[in-house]
Amino acid sequence: MDGDFSLFTGGQGGRKAVRNPFEEAFGTRPVPARPLDRGMGEAVGRRTVFRPSDREDFGRVADRVAAGNAGLLTTVGDAEIMQLRNAIATGALLTSGRHLQHGDSTQPDRNMEMFTNCATAICSFAKFYLLLNGSGVGRAYDDELCVVDWGQAPDLKFVLSLDHPDYPHDRASLLRFGLEMQILPWGTAQEAFDAEIEAQVRAFLERTVLARAPEGDELLHVIEDSREGWGKAVETIEAMAFRGERDRTLVLDFSAIRCAGSPIAGMQGRPASGPVSLLRGLLNVREHVIEAARAGDMPLWEQALRVDHYLSVEVQVGGARRAARMATKSWRDADVLRFIRAKEEGGLWTANHSVMVDAEFWDYVNDHAKADPLASHARTVFAEATRCAWINGEPGFINGDRLEDNRTGSARLKQVHADGRDFRSHRYQATEGAALLADLAQRATSAHFPVTTNPCGEITLHVTGGYCVIGDFAPLLACPVAPEDVTPGQVPAETAAVWDARVRDSVRLGVRFLLRANRMDALYGEEVRRTNRIGIGPTGLHEWAWVRFGLDFRDLLDEERAAPFWNAVRELSTIAKSEADAYAHETGTARPITVTTVKPAGTTSKLFGLTEGAHLPARRQYLRWVQFKGVRREDGTWEAGTDPLLPTYERKGYPVRSLRSFPGMSIVGFPTVPLIQRLGMGERVVTAPEASPEEQYRWLELLEKYWIGAEQGNQVSYTLKVYTDRHSLDSFRAMVAANQPHVRCCAVLPSRPDSGLGYEYLPEEEVSAGKFAAITAMIQDDEVREVVDWAHLQCASGVCPI
């Protein structure tokens, strides 16, 4: 086995004048771009990355992304730009889906939120605005961090002009309005929409929507046709609730919002959802939170949780943004059991729920000799959380005391500002909500958990707000020759030298890339300047370990046997942190509080068929099912309005099925083989269902030790499936209690084998090798393009929104 991996080789001279950290392994002339993985990779590229001007050439993507990022700092030289371009073009530096999608020469003039994967927020208007910008958002719902009583909000009235294209006048538009407002059962057809039902919809419309603003003392707010306008509307309501202005009336006019279906320029022309979507969200807030809080005893944290849910539903239903959320709550809160049961009771499906815990919590759980009231509370929390998680996978546990900013105390150094600067950029400025932000910032200084995580768990962020500025590097794809042509663990010395240098340079280039992104105009500009936080991490680790070092998953769990691999990982971590510190110093910015992470890497990894982040391959071979509009009639013909791709795929031999649970929709199955299955591993491939939970926890501990490191580290995002046909609830609890205290975070997801889940179909269906071969033999296709839908991008590592 060739295990040499040198930290300092080449490119280390000439630092006295202008420091050049690179080994120039990527060269300073353009290199050919790596083709995307056939099938899934190409489909994801078309769905999320390519623009018409890219002509489906990843090299053109690399050109614009490198140019846009380099434009953030005038001192970036041409040589670095070309090396950055080549690292991206080869796939060695994948950055993130956000950069690949949005990066171009306009980046210096755009807002940072379009380029950040995730964030945190301390109040609902901030969370909503970030979601509208495409961020996933985490929020802490600790009692000490929830202060707004939505029962004290003003009375809300809604206006939509009769002249607006989306105002319903005729029967067809009234039917659509009734369906969108959920007055009518989904799927109600035109022929069933009789005069009586139409009258019900008209009555609802007259009760809830005014055609013009009333005259009088009411406060009128015209909602602007922009993300900023929608965010400001919620800010106005939330700020008035914080001030206790229940006796006032706020009139919200939706008439300036563009009609549904209009293109959104900043989202590659994707269709706008129109005013009815926001109207529906605010109606739900009025009825299910404001009025409910006035009528009953709804705690403040639950009010906030429900407001955030109803607003994020509208972001997700719009279809152009993902609306991923993380909701956390301290185990110490007296009402945490209600939070734990919230998902079990149904309805709150837009957020992943986790309980923030610490070493004291685990001591109480694991030491039954302790019998004080807090110990009893901890054990009750653990028992109830694991009972609920055993049923639906939530809540999880996050070890808040192990998160970097809490561990070091840096989170408590954040200053409190009363002028709204904590949420201010050129595009959006918090005005009405400034006092609320200041109040919450002051509370956070003494909060037990001043930091939380983003929805995927890989970045530590202050509870009052911060960003995930993150990117992936793929060490396998830094190989200067086709990995399939390399004998695993026996890499020729010349090839190994270039390969290793490229890996090192991809880390250096990636760190600098992310630190430049921190220079963008940002809502959380104060926090970005304070922390200069980034997160760079590897993806395709299992493929790299196999081809470069000849090691499979179980080899990696043996530190002695896998020493060459783990030494390489540790040295890359050192490079990342050293380069981050040096580049921050050179550019006059703060030393980054965090540098290393491992993110889920779903989109970026799929482009090239890699295992995602730290995850094991989910399956050896599978059918990827994608929904299309249209069904076949009994006579064998396709219904009018059927997507023309459906009959095309069927003629080519792809499996096609009509759905019962989604009327009017059919699915097409695309045979998929991950890259790791094409590298000669054979039976040495270990899939996630084949690895024991203890093995996977050990893998996470090693990644935290060697890559995350003792300082300047975030977390490893990881979903560990525990199959309920192999483990009982008691063994599940024992496994969590024994292992979860020793990692920063890990999503443990009880599940059943695909065949036992009871769904009509799953986005990815594992099939036997024989069945897979039979299916592929039936397909005659050299031309038809595959597609991908949101289900596959959101199911990156097994956490599916089903």
Question: Over which residues does each language-model region extend?
Answer:
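Extended catalytic cores of very large enzyme megasubunits
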Residues: 1-802
